Amino acid sequence: MCIRDRPILPKMDRVGYWAIEAWGGATFDTCMRFLDENPWERLRSIKAQTPNTPLAMLSRGQNLVGYKHYSRDICNHFIKAAKRNGVHVFRVFDALNDIRNVVDNAEAIKECGGHFEGAISYTMSPVHTLDSFLDYGQKLKDLGADSICIKDMAGMLTPYRTERLVKAFNAEIGLPLHIHCHYVGGMAPANILKAAEAGAAIADTAHAPLAFGNSHPAVEMIVAALQESRYD
């Protein structure tokens, strides 16, 4: 999306979303590379149109929004600049779930009064067990995480694995749990339904024109699926 899509933002601001993820990750690079836009102006412009809804960004931990590790002072200044320009929720992940690459971000977020959402990169291997995810979740909590995100960036989660994860995190970690499932494998809508039933607090969706494929389930689909339930 580009800045010219701003007319939809006031309507989105009235929906009541927990947050709108509008910045960080690859969007910082791609808005310059393909749209010739200033990412900081883009952020300020979006925030001006969404005064009632917190904006969220994705940080790659020590990589921030780039493709290499940055120093502690750069992490500190970048996070605080993002907060000043409109970001409130900072979802921070490390692809290897290495807590050392999250520490500098976490400290800066807490210092500037942002919401630190610690993200757990979900994948499947002999070492990626439920206990390993819970252990990392506890490390994020110890760093001061305000919420935890299960980040299924490759669409590998299944509905019943999702249910087990959510129940275990609610029992052992006790922070609001956020489910982030890409639609790649087609199971994301079912994962969100099982997550809701198991007690997840938040789920990521996208508006229908930008949903499905490598994106997320459509918000319209999830709203319809939850109608006439206690999650409506």
Residue locations for each model-derived region?
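Catalytic cores and adjacent flexible loops of soluble metabolic enzymes
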Residues: R4-R91, A95-D232
